[in-house]
From Swiss-Prot:
It holds the Pfam family p450. This is Cytochrome P450 monooxygenase ple6. One of its GO terms (cellular component) is membrane. InterPro entries: Cyt_P450, Cyt_P450_CS, Cyt_P450_E_grp-I, Cyt_P450_sf, Cytochrome_P450_fung. It comes from Rhodocybe pseudopiperita. The lineage of its organism: Eukaryota, Fungi, Dikarya, Basidiomycota, Agaricomycotina. Keywords: Glycoprotein, Heme, Iron, Membrane, Metal-binding, Monooxygenase, Oxidoreductase, Transmembrane, Transmembrane helix.
């Protein structure tokens, strides 16, 4: 290379220098700013460069506790930074209503990495993308569940399963944990598929519980929840650092196998000319009208009812029995109120959902059980698809939005002694809150989600909770044993995506011989 060529090369490099230097400086600046909270976001815990708040994030099973602790320090709406990602935590009713309910068109989406591949699938409604055809079809189909005729069938099916439960509790009172699972599962399967789980020894129960247990273990792994925040990073991690991947494939296979087995039996009954009016028969009859083109999508539609309802309903009734074990004085108050409602029929028939609706104190108990420990302490995350403003904050497009239900329902600024079981708080105010508390947006249905993601099984769940719980108290005196938990501080609940009480002991004694006779009469009818 001669001297002129060298000069030309240096000149060419110098031409790019004015551009390259600012670009390099900008990239360095962006890297250093990664993890820093923008001033327009809600406040939050201090961040570290690049990491943001990543170093402070606990395991999933403890997440609700840390999020609630931060809420007491930074307020009902605050933000976290995970690298470049924004996460907004909602821990008061006003922000949930203002962001997830009122701005639902902008916040109905799920993060694309909410669950790790291969579980994530738009055919599974809880995680389906809001703007997908799958979500639209499922949402339309679930509207068939909330018709007046459907609601009447819920009550009938649940009362039928409650009769079986009462007989099981007479025969095997110590096995109430298993019997409550059968009752919730059979109620849902009957409504969805026209089938019943007749005994607590049915092999489907442990198979389904094993699959859900695997799912909860996977979701409890440290790091798995970052797939919602940094899906591209999770994709490239080796299996040694992403142990949930292998677990996810096994879970997906079991899940779809269960759903297709149930759907196949419905199809066979229809081919044989047997029509039972179940929800899935209605779906198959109207699948073209509803837009179902994929058989797996139909299978998932029914399956989400099993997965979404069995554990949550069983969890509620187990917590109810636990609270009655810890607070036996509540039982007699419920019976006294029920006696007034049923009158002369008190010892001659089982109570119904209609009876439950007339009972003020009993409904306070139901609400307090729901408040003291919700089935899912943290609601599955939402995702903003547009920029939005709330209460002076700017929340940019692409923000993960988390509703901390545990923190909302255990907020000491809202509830007196929030960790104590006090049904009477609902006798004093509609939502059991302290006098003078701002109740903007408060409602009894936070446990079912918010916005356009609210659970379509809300009505069925309310019927189930009241019918099953009231019958248990009508029929049995629940007595603590020496090893029974004494309070919620006794570490009685296993945390996780669905927080089940740990197995505990109590004694269930029939209230009278008349009760035993009534149960046998209706069970043998």
């Amino acid at each position: 290379m001669n001297l002129s060529e060298i000069k030309a090369a240096l000149l060419e490099r110098n031409m790019f220098a004015p551009v390259a230097i600012p670009v390099a400086c900008y990239l360095v600046y962006k890297l250093l700013r990664m993890g820093s909270r923008e001033k327009t976001l809600p406040p939050g815990p201090p961040t570290k460069p690049v990491l943001g708040n990543l170093h402070q994030m606990p395991a999933m099973n403890d997440m609700h506790l840390q999020l609630s602790k931060w809420a007491q320090e930074y307020g009902g709406i605050y933000s976290l930074k995970i690298f470049f990602k924004n996460v907004v935590i909602l821990t008061d009713s006003a922000s949930v209503t203002g962001i997830l309910d009122k701005l639902n068109a902008k916040t109905a989406e799920r993060p694309t990495g909410f669950l790790p591949a291969p579980i994530k699938d738009d055919r599974f409604l809880p995680i389906a993308l809001y703007k997908s055809d799958e979500f639209r079809i499922n949402h339309k189909a679930f509207k068939l569940l909330i018709s007046n005729d459907s609601i009447d069938r819920y009550a009938e099916n649940i009362e039928t399963e409650t009769i079986v439960l009462m007989k099981e509790l007479l025969a095997e009172p110590k096995e109430f944990f298993r019997h409550l699972v059968r009752t919730s599962m059979s109620s849902i399967v009957a409504i969805a598929y026209g089938e019943r789980i007749l005994t607590s020894s049915d092999p489907f129960i442990p198979y389904h519980e094993e699959y859900l247990h695997d799912f909860e273990n996977m979701m409890g792994l440290r790091g798995v929840h970052f797939t919602a925040l940094i899906p591209w990073l999770a994709k490239w991690l080796p299996d040694s650092l992403a142990g949930w991947r292998v677990m996810a494939q096994g879970i997906k296979d079991k899940q779809l196998g269960i759903f297709n087995d149930f759907l196949g039996r419905v199809e066979k009954r229809m081919e044989a000319g047997i029509f039972d009016g179940s929800h899935m028969q209605t779906i198959l009859q109207k699948k073209e009208e509803l837009g179902f083109k994929d058989r797996d999508l139909i299978a998932y539609h029914g399956g989400v009812m099993i997965d979404g309802g069995t554990d949550t309903l069983a969890m509620f009734t187990r917590v109810f029995v636990l609270m009655m074990t810890m607070h036996p004085e509540c039982q007699q108050k419920i019976r006294d109120e029920l006696k007034e409602v049923m009158g002369d029929e008190y010892d001659s028939r089982l109570p119904t959902y209609e009876d439950a609706l007339k009972m003020k104190y009993f409904n306070c108990v139901i609400r307090e059980v729901t408040r003291i420990w919700p089935p899912s302490p943290i609601v599955p995350p939402h995702y903003s698809t547009e920029d939005l403003e709330y209460d002076g904050y700017f929340i940019p497009k692409g923000t993960v939005i988390v509703m901390n239900l545990y923190g909302i329902q255990r907020d000491p600024k809202v509830f007196d002694a929030p960790d104590e079981f006090r049904p009477e708080r609902y006798m004093e105010s509609e939502f059991g809150t302290k006098p003078g508390v701002d109740l903007t947006g408060y409602r009894h249905t936070f446990t079912f989600g918010a916005g356009r993601r609210i659970c379509p099984g809300l009505k069925m769940a309310e019927i189930f909770k009241r019918t099953v719980s009231l019958n248990i108290i009508w029929g049995f005196d629940i007595k603590p044993l020496p090893n029974s938990p004494k309070s919620m501080k006794d570490d009685v609940v296993v945390p996780g995506p669905v927080s089940m009480p740990k197995p505990f002991e109590c004694e269930m004694v029939p209230r009278s011989q008349a009760v035993v006779q009534v149960i046998h009469e209706v069970a043998d009818y």
